[in-house]
């Protein structure tokens, strides 16, 4: 690539002096030399302590829990990493029903101390695979899904 037409500034931002193209991707090489793209540089959070944290791996790990439907990790310019978590209300409803406390009210579910403890155990277990500074320290449970219509998601679901 030779650069942007009649735009030297944009060319210098995108291509270094050796001809390497800055894609904005973050990745790593494994032991066999394979490249894994793991995130986008613009998606990185920088904590108030200056630690760079990629939120996507944590968000993806959390939604693998049967009790977590959606998660958003926050922490840019903050002392620690937090998360907004939408529980899997179907799984939570079953969890409470199995305890003899059936409810289908999302607000009651997210305020229930046993549900909060259950999600805390899930988050703690999931966070063990991450560095100490990357781990979600606090979370808030949200009583509805993040949607485009509510303005919480973009059309590309970000």
Predicted regions and their residues:
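Adenylate-forming
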Residues: 15, 34-63, 92-112, 132-136, ...
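Flexible loop/turn segments at secondary-structure boundaries
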Residues: 2, 29, 36, 44, ...
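C-terminal boundary motif of the adenylate-forming
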Residues: 26, 31, 65-91
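Conserved C-terminal "lid"/linker of ANL adenylate-forming enzymes
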Residues: 70, 122-158
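Conserved loop-to-beta-strand segment in the C-terminal subdomain of adenylate-forming
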Residues: 76-101, 129-143
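A generic "binding-loop/recognition-motif" signal
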Residues: 7, 41, 58, 77-79
């Amino acid at each position: 690539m030779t650069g942007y037409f009649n735009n030297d500034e944009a060319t210098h931002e995108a291509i270094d002096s050796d001809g390497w193209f800055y894609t904005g991707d973050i990745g790593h090489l494994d032991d066999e030399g394979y490249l894994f793209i793991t995130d986008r540089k613009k998606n990185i959070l920088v904590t108030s302590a200056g630690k760079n944290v990629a939120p996507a791996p944590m968000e993806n790990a959390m939604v693998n829990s049967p009790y977590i439907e959606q998660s958003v990790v926050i922490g840019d310019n903050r002392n620690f990493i937090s998360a907004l978590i939408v529980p899997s209300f179907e799984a939570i409803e079953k969890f409470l029903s199995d305890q003899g406390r059936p409810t289908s009210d999302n607000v009651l579910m997210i305020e229930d101390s046993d549900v909060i403890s259950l999600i805390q155990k899930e988050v703690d277990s999931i966070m063990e695979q991450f560095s100490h500074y990357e781990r979600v320290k606090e979370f808030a449970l949200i009583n509805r899904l993040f949607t485009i219509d509510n303005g919480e998601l973009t059309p590309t679901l970000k």
